[in-house]
Amino acid sequence: MKYIFLFLFLSLYTIIKSKPPEGYNLVWSDEFDDASLDTSKWVYNTGAEPNWGNNELQYYTKRQENIYLASGLLHIRARHESYEGSEYTSARITTRKKFDFKYGFIEAKIALPRGKGIWPAFWMLAANDKADEIDIIEAVNTENVVYSTCHWYPNGEYTHESGQTDTFDITQFHIYTVLWTEEMIQFAIDGNEHFTLNIKNSVRQTNSFHGNFYLLLNVAVGGNWPGFEIDDNQFPTEMQVDYIRIYKNN
């Protein structure tokens, strides 16, 4: 019986820790409960390299075969197929020019694909179209860890800081959160923090993280990070997203 109570306590603790701080209110969300993607919120990115800059192998489409909504979930599906000169297809969507924000609490419930050459991501780019980037979650290959990374360019020179989780089953649904304030960008999974970047007073020229950013979701195949050895037996494989919610502090 004590183990049941412990499980319930830990489950409740995770729920509480994964929720926004007191005083934060919902300002944007997508629960993915509609029949199709809400294009008032999202834009499809389509095409292949050199558009993406990572030597990825897939062609991003907006076809039902690669992106669809079902059972209250967004499905982004990577496939092995010949299409427009590429041997793989997938999907990538963004809120660019639809929604961007500065500071807040980001909450998303996501199940990630895992496999050799697979590179799913939930991330953000600067709304001013500079290259500054906040990678909320990325996973590569068969690793059962998730990486969170901030990229910026002090004095025009590239730098980054990142953190990673302990080993866990990334293919199951987990709650991924970011608390972004004037002082820090803090990343957590199921309420467990794994990386925090100090941006207080734009220390280390982190001033780019005091501007607006927009959201992106995608599943890449191959590329500079996962490499180019792809297990073709794993396809189709997909990311599933239950919801994304953005809260702001009053």
Set out the residue ranges of the language-model regions.
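Bacterial Sec-dependent N-terminal signal peptides
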Residues: 1-19
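GH16 jelly-roll
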Residues: 18-250
